[in-house]
């Protein structure tokens, strides 16, 4: 009892290094020393007064240990990071880098194999991404069948019109041309060349840019004959017998400082182009509205018109004049209130026309063909007779079968096309929708106005701009032919600026020809045409022609572009490659991303630590000392348990002298804390007795 009381008195006073009462008993001390994680038997079965005297001590606050996991935790080294990654990742082959670490040869083999596999996979990734960003397209072809809107049909007389308003100028041009042909080729027709008071030389001198013969040096043996660089018209009629001369006319700039000859090796081409050049100048003097054109009627050119076995009327066509092709008529254009529909294919369910092919007002020096010219196009597209038309022969029935096709292109990154031309840097001068031909002609007209100061008469012009005439623009011919060369070589950039439309409707045509009318039927056919139209056919077969235009079938083909590699396809291909080389899933990719992130963080922390150790050392100032102090304060408390070296646990003795003891430890560390086995011992926070 006295020992108990002594112990109680010692508990009331400060006892920094006194053991618990149960540890003072001999036999029980050995049991506790042999099994430290278990409870002391003396405390469990001892005096009740001892238990009451000690009482339950309040639980001390838990201090964080190295084994506890923080909210944000990073590995201490690269080695630890890679070992953790290889042990826990789902990527195949990574575990072999750790399992075979006792065999360096296997470790090296698997490391090289893993890196090569990784490189091969990302090489395939590069190919897949390269294919995706090249934006390839696939062409999808669909066949559809439905009622079809009949396209617009434009047909021209191939007979340049002799305007009454410029009759005198045209007759003067014909006389000068006849004189030129006589001087150059000794040709005289005696029909257009009339006698006058002026001589031939004086008559030719009244017209600028006369046609003349030019001597050129003979080409070397075996060399290819080429046209002048300034010429823009191809030699359609090659010369049979080579001579050391060419035919052309001279063109100069405004101040006559630069001149060139527009030459041709064929005299036919030279005369036609020279006559055409002067004919354009005469046409430019015509007023905007001509009464002679307004009086023109369809019956002067077309004898009969039927569509789906029903006769046409005046509301089904519109009329315009072309400088080279004469009077033109467009059937079923956008101005027609009720567009024609084709519900059946075949020659009897289309457009049938009987045409007059005679050329009473023919200008022989401007056009050398006879018949008619026809073109099939969309309702909202202009008729470019030079680009898409073809000629009809007199005395022949021409049957033209059509097949409709549509093409839908992809724009943006997949193709260079435009939806409506609003993003094209060329103003549309035509009253129609955007097409590539519309843009090209508008671009040339803009360049013509900018460089030459006047507009070309074959294309529409903006307001307040005059058509070219050498009476007002003396050097426009020089400018025009120079511009033609730049246009053909795309120095003007028109072919680059004018992109293709994203949606195009075209008609594939195929023609068949037959003699019409036949020998046995031509008498009554011509008699009926003469009685019906009050017109006498003089040359019979050469004065008429017939054309049939119809759908071959109502099936039409739709060609549409679609992306060959979409985002879904790309992800699928990437997943296939990842599974092929590593047999992993999307979560494995997340693991790789986590590994890269941890590598960056560890590298950053190591650099930061090195920076602090170099520039924030304690000897460099107060800031370094504060850093060290904060580092010590943030470190976990050490479990320091000093004890005298001469203390014997088997024999009790007096308390050690305060001079031999260490500074008092943190009392919170003397409280119970969980043991590795999960139980709480009274002496778990103290060092084992008997140690050095």
Curated annotation (Swiss-Prot):
RNA-binding as UniProt keyword: no
Low complexity bias spans: 56-65, 682-692
Post-translational modification: Ubiquitinated. Can be ubiquitinated at multiple sites and undergo monoubiquitination and polyubiquitination. Ubiquitination by NEDD4 or NEDD4L inhibits the ENaC channel through endocytosis, intracellular retention and degradation of its individual subunits. N-glycosylated.
Subunit structure and binding partners: Heterotrimer; containing an alpha/SCNN1A, a beta/SCNN1B and a gamma/SCNN1G subunit. Interacts with WWP1 (via WW domains). Interacts with WWP2 (via WW domains); inhibits the channel. Interacts with BPIFA1; the interaction is indirect via SCNN1B and inhibits the proteolytic processing of SCNN1A and SCNN1G and the activation of ENaC. Interacts with the full-length immature form of PCSK9 (pro-PCSK9).
Keywords: Cell membrane, Cell projection, Cilium, Cytoplasm, Cytoplasmic vesicle, Disulfide bond, Flagellum, Glycoprotein, Ion channel, Ion transport, Membrane, Sodium, Sodium channel, Sodium transport, Transmembrane, Transmembrane helix, Transport, Ubl conjugation
Region Gating release of inhibition by proteolysis (GRIP), residue ranges: 198-266
Family of the protein in this entry: Belongs to the amiloride-sensitive sodium channel (TC 1.A.6) family. SCNN1A subfamily.
Reactions mediated catalytically: Na(+)(in) = Na(+)(out)
Cystine crosslinks: 156-328, 252-259, 305-312, 417-502, 439-479, 439-498, 443-494, 452-479, 452-502, 454-468
Segments crossing the lipid bilayer: 109-129, 586-606
Residue spans of biased composition, Polar residues class: 628-637
Domain of life: Eukaryota
GO biological process: cellular response to acidic pH; cellular response to aldosterone; intracellular sodium ion homeostasis; multicellular organismal-level water homeostasis; sodium ion import across plasma membrane; sodium ion transmembrane transport
Residues in compartment: Extracellular: 130-585
Keyword Electron transport: no
Motif placement: PY motif: 663-667
Swiss-Prot/TrEMBL site (Cleavage by Furin) positions: 201-202, 227-228
Major subcellular location class: membrane
Protein's name in the database: Epithelial sodium channel subunit alpha
Cytoplasmic topological domain residue ranges: 1-108, 607-692
């Amino acid at each position: 009892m006295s020992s108990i009381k002594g112990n109680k008195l010692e508990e009331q006073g400060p006892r920094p290094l006194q053991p618990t009462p149960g540890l003072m008993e001999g036999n029980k001390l050995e049991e506790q020393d042999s099994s430290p994680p278990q409870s002391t038997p003396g405390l469990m079965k001892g005096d009740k007064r001892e238990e009451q005297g000690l009482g339950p001590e309040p639980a001390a606050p838990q201090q964080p240990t190295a084994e506890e996991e923080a909210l944000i935790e990073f590995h201490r080294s690269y080695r630890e990071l890679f070992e953790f990654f290889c042990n826990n990742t789902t990527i195949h082959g990574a575990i072999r880098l750790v399992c075979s670490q006792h065999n360096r040869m296997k470790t090296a083999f698997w490391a090289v194999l893993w890196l090569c596999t990784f490189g091969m996979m990302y090489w395939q990734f590069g190919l897949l991404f390269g294919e995706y960003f090249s934006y390839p397209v696939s062409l999808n072809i669909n066949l559809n069948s439905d009622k079809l809107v009949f396209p617009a049909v434009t047909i021209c007389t191939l007979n340049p019109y002799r305007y009454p308003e410029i009759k005198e100028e045209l007759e003067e041009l014909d006389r000068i041309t006849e004189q030129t042909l006589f001087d150059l080729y000794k040709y005289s027709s005696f029909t257009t060349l009339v006698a006058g008071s002026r001589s031939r030389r004086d008559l030719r001198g009244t017209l600028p840019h006369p046609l003349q013969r030019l001597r050129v040096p003979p080409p070397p043996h075996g060399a290819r004959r080429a046209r002048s660089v300034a010429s823009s018209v191809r030699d359609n009629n090659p010369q049979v017998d080579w001579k050391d001369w060419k035919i052309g006319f001279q063109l100069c700039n405004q101040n006559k400082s630069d001149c060139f000859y527009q030459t041709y090796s064929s005299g036919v081409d030279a005369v036609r182009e020279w006559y055409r050049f002067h004919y354009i100048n005469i046409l430019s003097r015509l007023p905007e509205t001509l009464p002679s054109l307004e009086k023109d009627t369809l019956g002067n050119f077309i004898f009969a018109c039927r569509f789906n076995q029903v006769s046409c009327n005046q509301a089904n066509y519109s009329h315009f004049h072309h400088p080279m092709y004469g009077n033109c008529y467009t059937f079923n254009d956008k101005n027609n209130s009720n567009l024609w529909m084709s519900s059946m294919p075949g020659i009897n369910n289309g457009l049938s026309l009987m045409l007059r092919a005679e050329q009473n007002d023919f200008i022989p020096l401007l056009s050398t063909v006879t018949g008619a010219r026809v073109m099939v196009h969309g309702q909202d597209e202009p008729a470019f007779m030079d680009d898409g038309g073809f000629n009809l022969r007199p005395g022949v029935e021409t049957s033209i079968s059509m097949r409709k096709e549509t093409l839908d292109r992809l724009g943006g990154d997949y193709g260079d096309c435009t939806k409506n031309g609003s993003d094209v840097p060329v103003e549309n001068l035509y009253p129609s929708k955007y097409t590539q031909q519309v843009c090209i002609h508008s671009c040339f007209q803009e360049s013509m106005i900018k460089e030459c100061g006047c507009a070309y008469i074959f294309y529409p012009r903006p307001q307040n701009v005059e058509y070219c005439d050498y009476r007002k623009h003396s050097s426009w011919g020089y400018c025009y032919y120079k511009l033609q060369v730049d246009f053909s070589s795309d120095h003007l950039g028109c072919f680059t600026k004018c992109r293709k439309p994203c949606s195009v409707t075209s008609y594939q045509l195929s023609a068949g020809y037959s003699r019409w009318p036949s020998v046995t039927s031509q008498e009554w056919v011509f008699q009926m045409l003469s009685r019906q139209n009050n017109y006498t056919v003089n040359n019979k077969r050469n004065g008429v022609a017939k054309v049939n235009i119809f759908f071959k079938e109502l099936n039409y083909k739709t060609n549409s572009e679609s992306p060959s590699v979409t985002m879904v396809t790309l992800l699928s291909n990437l997943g296939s490659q990842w599974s092929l080389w590593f047999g992993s899933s999307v979560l494995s990719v997340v693991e790789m991303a986590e590994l890269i992130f941890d590598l960056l963080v560890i590298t950053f922390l190591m650099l930061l630590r090195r920076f602090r150790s170099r520039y924030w050392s304690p000897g460099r100032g107060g800031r370094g000392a504060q850093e060290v102090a904060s580092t010590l304060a943030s470190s976990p408390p050490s479990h320091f348990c000093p004890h005298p070296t001469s203390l014997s646990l088997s024999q009790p003795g007096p308390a050690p002298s305060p001079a031999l003891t260490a500074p008092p430890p943190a009392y919170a560390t003397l409280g119970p804390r969980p043991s590795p086995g999960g139980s709480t011992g009274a002496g778990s926070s103290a060092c084992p007795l008997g140690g050095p």
